[in-house]
From Swiss-Prot:
The gene is FUB10. It comes from Gibberella fujikuroi (strain CBS 195.34 / IMI 58289 / NRRL A-6831) (Bakanae and foot rot disease fungus). Residues 16-47 bind DNA. It is found in: Nucleus. Fusaric acid is phytotoxic to plants such as cotton and banana. It has been shown to induce programmed cell death in plants. In addition to a mild toxicity to animals, fusaric acid exhibits acanthamoebicidal, antioomycete, and antimycobacterial activities. It comes from the Eukaryota. This is Fusaric acid cluster transcription factor FUB10. One of its GO terms (cellular component) is nucleus. Transcription factor that regulates the expression of the gene cluster that mediates the biosynthesis of fusaric acid, a mycotoxin with low to moderate toxicity to animals and humans, but with high phytotoxic properties. Residues 74-86 have a biased composition (Low complexity). GO terms for molecular function: DNA-binding transcription factor activity, RNA polymerase II-specific; zinc ion binding. Coiled coil: none annotated. Keywords: Nucleus.
Length: 419
């Protein structure tokens, strides 16, 4: 019989399980092939030889039946089709009763290996699995910790901008570089505040006499802005400081042309800005000029209605200010002149950053300087946009023409100086 190794020749005998597992030659006594092999005899263990495989070419495998499941039928039915030729006349019931030995021991035995050879590998997998699970656990804990540290209140929708959550723009902040998009958002918030202030100063009464008061304090009255309602002059002054800082973030640094770099080229003129950025900056400037125009008009009307007397008549405790050791008299006209020069200096900084031409400025521009060439409206394209926007304001009917508010402020400030 092909599977009986006792009738085989010595050179066709099967190796024992131990030699087969170690892939070694199984040496036996040539006269006694059924005895234990020399390696097992030397080791003093039992020599076990499993059922031998038949020698020669293995028989061709029978074709397995293909199972087709019909999807349309509600009941689970299967049809078997034989892909082998029908010449043999094989019965389908015999094919279904065919036993397949797919055990692990049989598969390993067919390739000359034993299941015990994988014990070491199983131990390795057991040792690796806790490591991988610990790594996945640590990654999950880190991700969970990061998710817990995120404040849900800071998650905002990209469809709307919350201006209240933007950082403050006070002059005491450090001069950090800001993106132009961020500056545009801050300019939009400033524009909204100036619009509300312009409406309030036109519709609500305010203390005109307090504009000319001289006071001496360790802290400016602007420090009480968050605690109580401030004077319109303080509010617009704070808006000027904020606008000056934002314009500095949009304009290229003036030292760029004096600092050559061997690795990168820095242009002397600022990069071209978007139309929205230029228009919103110009609108903020026009609103500030309009607010100052209303304030100085009220102040000039107040000076005309009162006599040129000392402020001691309406100030409870007159203070004496000194400049160069000389006392400054508490006079209304002098207070008005000081206020005009202060506002001119404040507007000059903004107009210099914007690069406005002479006929669009409130302050006087020095003839020997080129402070407007590097401003926002210093380029030819920006000048064209500025002229178009100003001309549009001149053509429409109303009392809030843009160029007229600049001229009106210059006239009333000159009148206060000459009063």
């Amino acid at each position: 019989m092909a599977g009986d190794f006792s009738n085989r020749a010595p050179w066709k005998r099967s190796a024992c399980d131990r030699c087969r597992a170690q892939k070694l030659r199984c040496h036996r006594d040539s006269g006694h092939s059924t005895d234990a092999c020399l390696r097992c005899l030397k080791s003093g263990i039992e020599c076990v030889t499993s059922k031998a495989r038949p020698t020669g070419r293995p028989p061709s495998r029978q074709v397995q039946p293909t199972v087709v499941v019909e999807q349309g039928d509600t009941s689970s039915s299967s049809h078997t089709t034989d892909s082998s030729p029908s010449a043999g006349g094989t019965d389908m019931s015999n094919m279904m009763n065919f036993e397949y030995d797919l055990s692990l021991d049989n598969i390993l035995d067919s390739i000359g290996m034993q299941h015990s050879d994988f014990i070491v590998n199983d131990n390795i997998l057991v040792d690796i699995s806790p490591l991988s699970s610990s790594q996945s656990t640590s990654q999950h804990s880190v991700a969970q910790a990061q998710a817990q540290t995120v404040d849900p209140s800071t998650i905002q929708s990209t469809a709307s901008y919350q201006f209240n959550t933007l950082p403050s723009t006070s002059s005491m902040d450090s001069a950090l570089p800001m993106r132009s998009d961020h500056v545009e958002l801050l300019l939009s918030r400033l524009h909204s505040k100036l619009s509300a202030q312009l409406y309030s100063i036109r519709s609500s009464p305010w203390d005109v006499k307090g504009t000319l008061n001289l006071s001496l304090a360790h802290q400016g009255i602007g420090q009480d802005f968050e605690n109580c309602e401030s004077h319109p002059l303080v509010q617009v002054s704070q808006a000027c400081t904020e606008l000056e800082r934002l314009l500095s973030g949009l304009r290229a640094p003036a030292s760029a042309e004096h600092t050559p770099s061997t690795f990168s080229y820095t242009p002397a003129v600022p990069p071209r800005l978007r139309i929205t950025q230029l228009l919103i900056a110009l609108s903020c400037y026009i609103q500030i000029v309009s607010i100052y125009g209303i304030i100085f008009s009220k102040v000039f009307d107040y000076l005309l209605s009162t006599s040129k007397t000392s402020v001691g008549s309406y100030q409870s405790s007159p203070l004496t200010l000194y400049i160069g050791g000389l006392p400054i008299p508490p006079n209304e006209t002098l207070s008005g002149n000081l206020l005009v020069h202060l506002i001119e200096h404040q507007l000059h900084q903004i107009e210099q950053l914007m690069g406005l031409p002479e006929h669009y400025r409130v302050s006087s521009r020095a003839k020997d300087t080129k402070d407007g060439e590097l401003g926002l409206f210093g380029s030819q394209h920006s000048q064209s946009l500025l002229n178009a926007a100003i001309q549009l304001g001149e053509d429409r009917d109303g009392n809030h023409d843009d160029i007229r508010c600049v001229r009106a402020l210059k006239i009333v400030m000159r009148q206060i100086k000459d009063f």
